[in-house]
């Protein structure tokens, strides 16, 4: 057992016979989560994080946050602006672990009056976070598994990490399960085309980029984890997530990080421009050149990078905001993505949540043209102040017996609307097809 501070305890075990999925299946408890990095994604993160049995939950709707304490069973209501309340309520505990996340909040957030998932048939909070004192870290580089517990209350008794280690090494798992779904409703291409064309015609100096949701709804029966496993196998990405809430499960994959904060270092990796991988190395390189040389994509990407720079300058020392990598082609299993990396130094009086607010909000402190539309992000806010959120690009929410699927479409004045529609239609068909498992569709 290693002690890193009076409140933080760690235990490291050999994980060469384990996987994040196996650990998750053996882990006992409620409100479990799994944040994975894809080993098949170029530049993917080193760690995956697993947890269960949160200490408390924060659920924000409008200008109110409900705090549910699982220790006392009591619910507290806090009134005020969402990010102001989150900064006040999120526990901040210094520790010296080498991991980017060693305990804290896991969940999702939208902006303004919208939720992370835009669908009138499902009501989700504007923000929903579980706070975990105990988490499990899987190191993909060393195959080590580290169990970490951080006490929110200094006087609270420490849990038995030896017992937890035995649970994930020798614990029982249930038999493999399956799922079935039956599509019910979808945004029609005709109506979506009308929306896209109308929005593009109204782009101007104040609104230069639009993020729009396109949704599908289906009946769902079976195991939500089986659905996630099928998704991660067929569509690996830099970010993969599965989070259980009281009455719904959020799962999905995303190639795009929204924002990361590590101490005073702020990192954004905007992504704009995607094309399929080639079947051979030569075709892959040909697709890469075509993506890189496409003028409309480069213009849209440059516009996005400029917008993100301005957003970061509102929360960082302005002179510190630099484009470290410009228009780099990044590879995932199925696609090529054009990304840039922007870094800055956080202003000392600000919180990591101020950075999230600046980058997810359509109206930050700058006068630079902003984004219109609806989207959200999912990730963690650590006790140590670190933060990492991914855009919830292609997400699934399972609520009761209904599966809500949503994709987000980004458009600028340089976007070819017809190409976007063809791409969306193809992605939808491919996305639904890859979910078919053991006769998954009725």
Feature annotation, model-predicted:
Residues 1-59, 441-442:
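An N-terminal JmjN-like helical accessory module and its immediate linker preceding a catalytic domain
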Residues 10-14, 23, 146-167, 260-333, ...:
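Cytosolic ligand/metal-binding cores
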Residues 24, 58, 107, 136, ...:
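A residue-level signal for conserved active-site and pocket-lining positions in enzyme catalytic cores
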Residues 30-39, 105-106, 208-211, 237-244, ...:
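A short, Trp-centered hydrophobic/proline-enriched beta-strand micro-motif
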Residues 33, 63-70:
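Short polybasic amphipathic segments
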Residues 37, 71, 78-217, 398-401, ...:
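Non-catalytic accessory segments adjacent to catalytic cores
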Residues 45-59, 209-298, 314, 319, ...:
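An anion-binding catalytic pocket shared by soluble metabolic enzymes
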Residues 338-442:
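Conserved hydrophobic core element of enzyme catalytic domains
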């Amino acid at each position: 057992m290693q002690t890193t501070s009076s409140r933080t305890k760690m235990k490291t075990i050999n994980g060469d016979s384990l996987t994040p999925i196996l650990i998750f299946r053996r882990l006992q408890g409620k409100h479990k989560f799994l944040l994975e990095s894809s080993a098949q994604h170029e530049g993917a993160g080193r760690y995956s994080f697993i947890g269960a049995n949160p200490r408390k939950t924060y659920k924000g709707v409008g200008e109110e946050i409900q705090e549910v304490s699982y220790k006392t069973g009591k619910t507290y209501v806090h009134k005020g602006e969402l990010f102001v309340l989150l900064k006040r309520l999120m526990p901040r505990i210094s520790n010296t672990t080498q991991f980017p996340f060693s305990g804290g909040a896991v969940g999702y957030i939208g902006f303004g009056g919208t939720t992370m998932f835009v669908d009138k048939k499902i009501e989700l909070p504007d923000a929903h976070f579980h706070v975990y004192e105990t988490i499990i870290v899987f190191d993909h580089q060393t195959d080590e598994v580290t169990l970490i517990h951080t006490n929110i209350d200094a006087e609270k008794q420490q849990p038995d990490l030896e017992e937890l280690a035995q649970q994930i090494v020798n614990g029982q798992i249930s038999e493999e399960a399956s799922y079935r779904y039956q599509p019910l409703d979808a945004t029609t291409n005709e109506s979506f085309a009308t929306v896209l064309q109308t929005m593009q015609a109204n782009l101007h100096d104040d609104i230069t980029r639009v993020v729009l949701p396109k949704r599908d709804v289906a009946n769902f029966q079976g195991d939500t984890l089986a659905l996630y496993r099928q998704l991660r196998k067929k569509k690996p990405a830099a970010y993969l997530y599965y989070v259980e809430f009281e009455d719904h499960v959020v799962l999905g994959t995303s190639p795009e990080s929204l924002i990361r904060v590590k101490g005073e270092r702020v990192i954004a990796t905007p992504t704009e421009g995607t094309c399929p991988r080639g079947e051979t190395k030569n075709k892959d390189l040909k697709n890469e050149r075509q993506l890189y040389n496409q003028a409309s994509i480069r213009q849209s990407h440059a516009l996005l990078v400029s917008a993100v720079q301005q957003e970061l300058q509102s929360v960082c020392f302005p002179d510190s905001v630099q484009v470290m990598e410009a228009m780099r082609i990044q590879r995932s299993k199925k696609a090529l993505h054009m990304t840039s990396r922007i870094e800055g130094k956080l202003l000392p009086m600000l919180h990591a949540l101020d950075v999230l607010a600046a980058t997810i909000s359509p109206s930050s402190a700058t006068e630079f043209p902003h984004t219109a539309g609806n989207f959200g992000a999912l990730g963690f806010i650590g006790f140590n102040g670190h933060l990492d959120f991914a855009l919830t690009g292609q997400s699934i929410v399972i609520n009761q017996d209904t599966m809500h699927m949503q994709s987000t479409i980004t458009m600028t004045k340089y976007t070819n609307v017809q190409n976007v529609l063809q791409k969306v239609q193809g992605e939808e068909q491919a996305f639904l097809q890859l979910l078919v498992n053991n006769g998954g569709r009725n």
